[in-house]
């Protein structure tokens, strides 16, 4: 698992571009660059996170309405890797057939992408992890996939509430103290530095993420 102690470097994003949207694996980019996937429930802030770390306010389309990401979206960063925004899970207002289609897209990507280097799981810091969050974490653990956990919307909590809530999320997820949970805010930039450090470490040494 990632450890932010000791020597570290921070990734500098100098180029970021949207490349394509896909449903099936044959539509994924063919340049064999590594993927870092973003997973989380609908409206957890995946698109906002992309815009924050790339310093591009409109690179990924954001919406206050859950369920707007309906395809697998590929963003190429520094011509070195892709951030891949997957459809959000757990949005009840979407018809069952549409949810099943999203589920198929997510499962296809996660199970059949040899370029998948790691996963960023986003969880709303204001709430306990959902059953869908737990299911996703179990999948990630089963496949021993390198993981970064972001606790989003940290600006919605007072500073004194952030650490207790992160500790509560850690207990609910049953992850070790060696797995950092990064409080993150797209509004204030909190956690951006640590996320860029984590991404840099993951890309340079993915096996070093394995606990």
Where are these regions (language model features)?
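Canonical P-loop GTPase G-domain recognition
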Residues: 13-25, 157-211
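Flexible beta-alpha connector loops of hexameric P-loop NTPases
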Residues: 89-99, 155-158
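Conserved G1/Walker A P-loop phosphate-binding module
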Residues: 2-93, 209
């Amino acid at each position: 698992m990632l450890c932010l102690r000791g020597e570290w470097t921070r990734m500098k994003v100098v180029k970021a571009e949207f490349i394509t949207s896909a449903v099936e694996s044959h539509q994924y980019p063919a340049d064999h660059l590594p993927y870092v996937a973003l997973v989380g429930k609908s409206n957890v802030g995946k698109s906002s996170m992309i815009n924050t770390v790339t310093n591009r306010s409109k690179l990924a389309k954001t919406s206050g309405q859950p369920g707007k990401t309906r395809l697998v979206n590929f963003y190429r960063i520094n011509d070195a890797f892709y951030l891949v925004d997957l459809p959000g899970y757990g949005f009840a207002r979407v018809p069952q057939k549409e949810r099943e289609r999203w589920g198929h897209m997510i499962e296809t990507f996660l199970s059949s992408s040899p370029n998948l280097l790691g996963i960023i799981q986003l969880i709303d810091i204001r709430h306990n992890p959902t059953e869908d969050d737990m299911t996703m974490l179990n999948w990630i653990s089963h496949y021993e996939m390198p993981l970064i956990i972001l606790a989003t919307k940290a600006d919605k909590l007072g500073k004194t509430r952030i650490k207790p809530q992160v500790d509560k999320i850690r207990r609910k997820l049953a992850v070790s103290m060696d797995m950092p949970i990064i409080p993150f805010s797209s509004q204030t930039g909190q956690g951006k530095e640590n996320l860029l450090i984590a991404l840099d470490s993951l890309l340079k040494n993915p096996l070093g993420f394995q606990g």
